[in-house]
């Protein structure tokens, strides 16, 4: 392609150009591609959370769209996106998102509005729409601030659990091994001040 034609292709970005059929084809192709929703970074602006089968978020895309005239178009909120939870069967780790979290919205290939928590068999699409932002899911945990409550699995085969406000366990705790609290072993600690009768021991050592 000559230098003159290259300049013309780059300078004409709309369907009305008569300089090159390539421009027209390129314009139409880009418009078709722009209608295909894949994934986009988002910010959480609303949360419907809980310990039920599913939670939802409302999100705002963090990247503006571009019009045919190369002008920025402000995005609008996307509503009622199911958010990801680490779960297998009836066991789960529940970390509900909060307003202000950043993550990734991904979009299904077809209308999946007919699929819900009770679905066990393939369903017909709810409509003929495809690759639409109406069929989004939210994956959290991208580009957020440092956490203050976390579980850290380390390469030395230890686990560090940090929860400055305390830990609540609902159930029986079984420990295969020792428990050490403030340097005192549960299995091998001793007590002083032991006398027969109704006396009490001193604290553990």
Language model segments and positions:
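Hydrophobic packing positions characteristic
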Residues: 2-166
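Protruding loop/beta-arch "assembly-hinge" segments enriched in small, turn-prone residues
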Residues: 2-3, 188-205
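Low-complexity, small-hydrophobic/phenylalanine-enriched stretches
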Residues: 153-185, 189-195
């Amino acid at each position: 392609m000559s230098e003159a034609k290259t300049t013309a292709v780059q300078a004409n970005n709309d369907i009305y150009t008569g300089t090159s059929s390539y421009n027209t084809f390129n314009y139409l192709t880009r418009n078709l591609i722009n209608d295909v929703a894949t994934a986009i970074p988002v910010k959480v602006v609303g949360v419907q959370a809980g310990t039920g089968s599913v939670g939802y978020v409302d999100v705002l895309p963090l990247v503006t769209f571009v019009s045919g005239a190369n002008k920025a178009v402000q995005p609008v909120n996307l509503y009622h996106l199911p958010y990801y939870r680490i779960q297998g069967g009836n066991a789960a780790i529940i970390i509900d998102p909060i307003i202000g979290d950043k993550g990734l919205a991904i979009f299904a290939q077809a209308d999946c509005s007919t699929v819900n928590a009770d679905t066990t068999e393939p369903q017909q699409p709810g409509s003929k729409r495809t690759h639409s932002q109406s069929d989004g899911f939210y994956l959290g945990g991208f580009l957020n601030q440092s956490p203050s409550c976390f579980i850290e699995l380390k390469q030395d085969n230890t686990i560090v659990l940090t929860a400055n406000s305390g830990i609540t366990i609902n159930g029986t705790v079984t420990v295969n091994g020792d428990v050490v609290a403030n340097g005192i072993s549960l299995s091998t600690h001793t007590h002083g001040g032991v006398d027969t009768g109704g006396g009490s021991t001193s604290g553990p050592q």
